[in-house]
Regions:
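Copper-binding active sites and cupredoxin-like electron-transfer domains
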Residues: 1-170
Length: 170
């Protein structure tokens, strides 16, 4: 069973300041059971650029799961609102389950800096590419994130059908 986020309600308001710009980003969780390669918007982390965001913006991800598997999506360094029927009292989370063929909307205040990791918490899905680097504009690249992308690209090049990988994620 997956949680019904419409049943969750925060005790206090979780809304962000209304004077901030809102950046909406559509992310389709993709992959299949034949090749067992997972991605976002049909691409793995090594094939895709970082998602650039601006400090101070409200970032809204619309996560659509186009697969037949559950994907618990986790964002490092930020709590996000799971936008639901409770509006101002939508719950705060750092991981959200996106059920098969469903869409969940999350939003967070971009109040950090540098690079942060957004990925499926099913580690094999993460290792095969269902992840993105979220990067604040003007930040220097995080060497650990660059290393993960290079490792994944090398593994995919060496064996296009299946691979064992490793990623250190803090």
């Amino acid at each position: 069973n997956t949680p019904d986020y419409d049943q969750l309600q925060a005790e206090e308001k979780t809304v962000f300041p209304t004077d901030r710009p809102i950046r909406e980003i559509a992310l389709e969780l993709s992959g299949d059971m034949r090749r067992y390669i997972w991605g976002i918007n049909g691409r793995t982390i090594s094939q895709e650029e970082k998602i650039l965001i601006r400090r101070g913006d409200i970032v809204r991800f619309r996560l659509t799961n186009g697969t037949m598997m559950l994907h618990p999506m986790h964002l490092h360094g930020h709590y996000f609102r799971v936008v639901n029927q409770h509006g101002d009292y939508s719950p705060l989370k750092h991981t959200v389950n996106v059920s098969p063929m469903q869409t969940v909307t999350i939003e967070f205040l971009a109040d950090e800096e540098k690079d942060w990791f957004f990925h499926c918490h099913l580690l094999y899905h993460m290792l095969t590419g269902m992840a993105r680097a979220i990067s604040y504009e003007g930040s220097e690249p995080d060497p650990d994130m660059v290393a993960i992308q290079k490792l994944h690209l090398r593994d995919m090049r060496d064996n296009q059908w299946f691979f064992w990988g490793r990623a250190d994620v803090g």
